[in-house]
Amino acid sequence: NHTTSAGAFLFLVNGTDAPLHYNGTTWTAPTITGITPANIISVISHKKRLWFTLKDSTQAAYLATEAVAGAATTFQFGSLFSKGGYLNALATWTRDGGQGADDYLVAISDRGQVALYQGVDPAEADTWELVGVFDVPRPIGRRCFVRYGADLLLITLEGVFPLSQLLAVDQSQSTRVAITDNISPAFASYARLYSGNFGWETVVYPKGTRLIVNVPVAESERAEQFVMNTISG
């Protein structure tokens, strides 16, 4: 969802078809120039600006502040991903549970490298800064991030991790901070068998105090879930 002074918009993208957005009344195919819109495989709203992940590319693209169409500007992450691969997903990390100056833009490669940026305008060097690049376990799926309070959870081949803790430990010790540590053998087995299937996703269900990890056992046919109580763990 992307909220602007003109209203709230729901964006739909899939990396194959032209994007659509919905304003509560009408579906519209926005005109986006500077890139091939059908290559947009995921979208986030970060600091009042839409950011797009481009399919099988190390580039992202972004629109002007509060824009829902118009000229897109590309942003290259390739030089930061020393292990190669492509940009797998983007996320916005609020860190304080709200929207503020300390929000980070998070970019992760399919090979397991995370780049963090802080700032407002990526076109202005004075207000845009690379915080760092971190090695992490390889992510599973394009929907590998979910907001969890002031943190982000990341689904990887080695488990589900709070990003704040994952970036604070050496990768050799990372499994001990996974929220899936208690079920690590089962999770590892599912990851080994089904990580290539579409549909991996973590869902937070606050009313039921549950966190659910969806595992597509048979793509588009059958899924199983890991469920955690968010209070008792």
Q: Which sequence ranges carry the predicted segments?
A:
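Beta-sheet-dominated scaffold domains
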Residues: 4, 10, 92-233
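Beta-rich catalytic cores
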Residues: 6, 37-39, 46, 86, ...
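Structural signal for beta-propeller blades
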Residues: 18-20, 59-61, 114, 160
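Asp-box/WD-like beta-propeller blade repeats and closely related beta-sheet repeat scaffolds
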Residues: 23-47
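Solenoidal tandem-repeat scaffolds enriched in leucines and small polar residues
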Residues: 43-100, 110
